[in-house]
Swiss-Prot record:
Catalytic activity: N(6)-carboxybiotinyl-L-lysyl-[protein] + acetyl-CoA = N(6)-biotinyl-L-lysyl-[protein] + malonyl-CoA
Cofactor binding remark: Binds 1 zinc ion per subunit.
Segments of this protein annotated with the region Disordered: 1-20
InterPro entries in the cross-refs: AcCoA_carboxyl_beta, Acetyl_CoA_COase_Trfase_b_su, ClpP/crotonase-like_dom_sf, COA_CT_N, Znf-ACC
Name recorded for this polypeptide: Acetyl-coenzyme A carboxylase carboxyl transferase subunit beta
A GO CC term attached to the entry: acetate CoA-transferase complex
Keyword set, alphabetical order: ATP-binding, Cytoplasm, Fatty acid biosynthesis, Fatty acid metabolism, Lipid biosynthesis, Lipid metabolism, Metal-binding, Nucleotide-binding, Transferase, Zinc, Zinc-finger
Amino acid sequence: MSWLSKLMPSGIRTENTPAKKRSVPEGLWEKCSNCGSALYGPELEENLEVCPKCDHHMAIRARARLNSLFDPDTATTEIAAQLGPVDALKFKDQKRYGERIKASQKASGEYDALIAMRGTLKGNPLVAAAFDFAFMGGSMGSVVGERFARAAEVALEVGCPFVCFSASGGARMQEGLFSLMQMAKTSAALGRLREAGLPYISVLTHPTTGGVSASFAMLGDINIAEPHALIGFAGPRVIEQTVRETLPEGFQRSEFLLDHGTIDQICDRRQMRDRIAELTAMMMRQPHPQDADAA
């Protein structure tokens, strides 16, 4: 500090005196991973994590997705919430599986990668499940398969449609064959729904790959995808290395799959609630959801 600064009253600050740093609450601002725009967190959350500048669909947590689908205060019944993963194989790679489970549970706040709930959509009963990619990349293990199967059974008991939002890297390798068995279990559960004449709508979000895409994610009576979602079994880089050819532009993206008849339609996340309400009402031969709301 200079001799002049010492003589100046304490209330006067010189140019060299550092100003107090104002702390910005964490998560108040986010950056769009597509266009790079700075986005105000609360507004982005209200917009269902879709960038208002470029319409890029960013990652959204499972509970936020389900809350945006169900009627307010109706999704009070969570299905098989008490189930948690078990390290039956005592698997260890760079880290023990048990340690990975604890770390993922702490980071995500969830017991496992799939959340299933029962509620209503525009007055009509509905069962829905959603993957949380924040939990071990949305990988499918025994708990995911069991929760999915139980959700399908609840839909069967209630006699209502079942909707699942997929976002997964595939089967969870740390559970070995226990994980692969879930492909058959979930597909069999959907078979029972189909026999009962109850609709299943599969919503494929970014990314939907591996064993999830090879089982229930592609078994919907109607398969809907979010814009520009990566959907496929193996990733494009793996395929290029295997076939030693350059893949077409946009390969495995939802727009490419729609053009080639792999999925039925693409829907913006902000319109997804209305779209699913219309489709389920039509398939269940119920009144138009807007008419039901008006009544």
